[in-house]
């Protein structure tokens, strides 16, 4: 339940409650379909109907997963994850995912290698051992994603102390359509993987 605790928003955001107070059991479904057994005291339950949308938050995502109600019987709701392509296009500046394994990123002008903490088609968060960049600096970022080499400019938005080093946030500058598509596909893939992990953790 830990990955599901942050919150559950209904389609109109008329009510907000912690997921642990709403869901009795989280059951794995087929592919991107899940069965939620809701607490009958859940305030949004009477308002959820077939075709409605609601959102479920996972710790690894900065944006909720959008779900569509397929069936509803008493306190059970069968829902399907909506196309992540639609989600990242609508909110692509904000939907970030954490890599499942370390991804090194080379900052050319500083001759420094960092590690990607999170990524979206809008930018990346990078772990650095030393504070080598300042806000508003534009640098060249080079990294590999799913076997594809990416080289693009990034503007540093902030640098803050983080663990035993620093976290720097970069906004991509003039990202090409090709690179945007590569990153977008990766983000969607990771969202699907995270949703699967989230379901499996509740079995």
Swiss-Prot record:
Residues 90-188 form the PilZ domain. One of its GO terms (molecular function) is cyclic-di-GMP binding. InterPro entries: PilZ_domain. To A.aeolicus aq_820 and aq_1583. This is Uncharacterized protein aq_1211.
